[in-house]
Amino acid sequence: MIKPMLAQDFQKDLSQRKIEKYAEDNDKFFVQPKLDGIRVIADLATGNLYKRSGVEVTNCPHLNGTVLELGLLIPGYEFVDGELYNHSLDFSDINSLVSRTVNILDTECIQLHLFDMSGEDIFEIRNLVLRKAINKLPLFSKMKNSSIYSVETYGLESMDDVLAKHKVFIENGYEGTMLRLNHLPYENKRSNQLYKIKDFTDSEFKIVGWNEEENHPGYLGSFEVADGVGNTFAVRPAVTREIRKEYWEDRISLINDKLTVRYQEKSKDGIPRFPIGIDIRYDLKEAKKYDPKPDIPINDTSFHRGW
């Protein structure tokens, strides 16, 4: 199984120190828009596509042949790294199509957007080799309309430039920004050369129920919350086990209290995506009962899909 390179969280203090250290000796950052698709590794020897979990994607046959042809243009390289994506579709639509087992011809709208590849060179060189090969595909391939694209990449000189470009990516409908440092080869692990930058929203939702921790009776697993327009969803609070136990013991008294939820965005159905509970707002007449003391950073997205 080929393991992809995974990103660090840009907002963590350790990440900031790593980036500052890099900037002392280097004067170039690379950024790409963060796509909201399905992360895949494409094997250049076989044309096969594999999700991060190692599961093969078998219902996008329109891509397999072109991956093989791409491999012929860059002999000696093992794989390319990207996402199954279409900027006109949201993630739920993409996921539904990629998971389809019937009517797979309908998946031809799914494109392969590539942002990196295997190799011992630094990112700038890997990216150049990849883009040149992709640009040759329409001439090389028998397919007139290729479904493989290179993700737009920008070389920038400062973090101010990076954050300005991040704002542009968000305005253009992307999920965020991938920041790449330019001093290491491709790494099949969570790497200190790759960082994801995302914006978050905090909103309050009414607690209407609860779920016990699976395999750990007596501890809260998640709250069920409502948004006031008919949607309910589960949110796991980012607190210590001790406080999850207290939440479970006090679960009845917490009904109708407000849970502050941090999330990336809402789905087309209006449900927050990747929600994390960060605080409970009690009646203002009462003293705050719990200090959240998260056991995971509330900005940590390392458990999120793909990266």
Where are these regions (language model features)?
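Short, well-ordered loop/turn elements at secondary-structure boundaries
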Residues: 24-27, 35-38, 108-109, 171-174, ...
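Classical nucleotidyltransferase
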Residues: 32, 38-82, 186-307
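Covalent nucleotidyltransferase
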Residues: 19-143, 306-307
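Acidic carboxylate-rich catalytic motifs and surrounding loops in phosphoryl-/glycosyl-chemistry enzymes
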Residues: 145-160, 263-265
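Amphipathic alpha-helical
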Residues: 1, 152-201, 212
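Charged, flexible boundary elements
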Residues: 1-25, 31
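Short, motif-level signal for alpha-helix interfacial/capping segments enriched in acidic residues
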Residues: 13-20, 93-99, 156-163
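Short, structured patches in soluble enzyme cores that scaffold and shape functional sites
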Residues: 82-84, 114-119, 134, 152-155, ...
